[in-house]
Structure formats: C-alpha cells, structure tokens
Amino acid sequence: MAPDGAVRGSAGDPDLAGLYRATATPARVDVPQLQCLMVDGAGDPETTPAYADAVGTLYAVSYGLRFMAKAIGEQPWKVGPLEGLWWADDPDAFLTDTRAEWRWTMLIVQPTRVTADLVGRALDAAVAKGRAPAAEHLHLDVLDEGTAFQVLHVGPYDAEGPTIAGLHRAIAEQGYALRGAHHEIYLGDPRRSAPERLRTIIRQPVQAPEDVPQG
C-alpha cells in the first residue's frame, strides 16, 4: 500500500549517508523509516523474467521522478542504489541454493519530497514509453528496519557466504538475534564491473539483547 504522503528519512537526505557506507568489519546501525519504491517477486534472479522487469521498472520510475523535479525547477537528487530484501518460506532454500524458492522485494529508496501522486505520474510516463513492465506490481511503501548490523562484501554475489557468516557471528557475539529479511544494497553495477570488484552492503535487522528469549 502506498503511504498518503512522504515519510521522514530517505537515501536522498544527507543525514542518512552513513547508511550507505560500510567496511569489512560488521557494525551496528540505526535505520530510520525509509520511503521506497518496491516490487515483490519470487524465483531465481538470474533466470526469472520478473526479476529483470522489476529492476527495469524501479530504475525507470526513479529516474522519471528525478527528471520531473528538475523540470519544475526543484533541486534534483541522485537516484539511490538498487536494494533487495531476500527470504524464503524454507530458510534451507538459501543453504541449498534452491533459487526457485527464493522470494524477494527489490527497492530504491526515495527522497521525502516524493509523494504517491508524483509516483503515479512518473509511472504513467514510464508505461507510455514501454519502460515499466512490472508497473502493476510497483508500490510506494515504508521500510522500517530499526536496529541492524551491516558489513561490506567485495566480490561476486555468489561468494557472499563467508561475509554473511561473519556478520551473523558478530551479531550473536553481541547478544542480538536475527530479525526480518536479509538486505543487500548493490553499490556496484554488474554490467559495468568485474565480479571481483562488485561492492555490496549486507544488512541484517536484529532483535535487541533484552528482547532475545533466554535459556
């Protein structure tokens, strides 16, 4: 469901720049509510047409919103990176690489000035140009992760395993528990970067120590 208006906090706001920085050492971050364009789907991202459709639609509408702002004299913003939330009904689907069972929400965070009305206009323009194949699945929504840990992975996506294991280990060592979907922020474009140079922030929302069941 799209919110009635803008939600405080987005990747377009300077005070959130820290959310898009990470190092090889896992660190805790406090993530405010973020307004996002989202498309939900399922299946192998490398072979499922719906995945490519989702990504193409997100970029088309996000850049359309930026150009609309520029056209009316507003200061344009930089379009944020592609992000993905990943989960499966059976968590073992990730351990066994059973990609057909993967579920995902691809998203791009939007500035606070973006409203549902603006999104509708940008989407209509993208549809008219044939650039929004996932138009019926696009929605403006709020991502509310709260406390999380994140780490930078450098290298191919299919080599993230040790980085994720290290992140989960750091979370457990500090008394937190995993909560919510696995979150990836793609700082590198696989179409333009060698696999070994891809940079991905891996974020995991957590449950506070005092809320973790004991014994």
Feature roles, as predicted:
Residues 1-215:
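A solvent-exposed interaction/effector surface
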